[in-house]
Amino acid sequence: MLFKYWVVCLLLFILFIQARASSFMPAVTNYLAKDYEAGYQNWACAQGSNGEMYFGNSQGLLVYDGYRWTLHKVPGNHIVRSVYVKEDRIYVGAFEEFGYFKYSEAGTLRYHSLSKFLKNFPMENNEIWNIVELDGRIYFQSFSAWFSYDGKMVRAL
């Protein structure tokens, strides 16, 4: 008798949970390319400590502050494939180009190329697909090489 009681209670609980779950809608907002006025493809995403969202987009770096979208281009107007945020810098990787964006005193994002400081390494056909941090260094990964940035110097590994 006690077993039947627990089985009935369990079945009622499962039915209740299922009914509640079917009415659950996750808090997701879908944005179309016409909403943010940039390319259709977003390749990477990161969030800054200020709450802003950063997207590697087919037309550059997309920034969403919760109210408006802004697009920031990299040299050559290449696709931004990777994004990594560390403190006040937004590191990006693109085709034959990598570096970081940083807010100026006027509050606008300015791009600083790191790949232009590479000595004796051709960036031809290199695309930065991944950015990671390890032991205080930022590493940029392409299909053929890794690049290390310690805050002062860039070098190919």
What do the PLM-derived regions correspond to, one by one?
Residues 1-157:
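Carboxylate-rich, polar loop motifs that coordinate divalent cations or form catalytic acidic clusters
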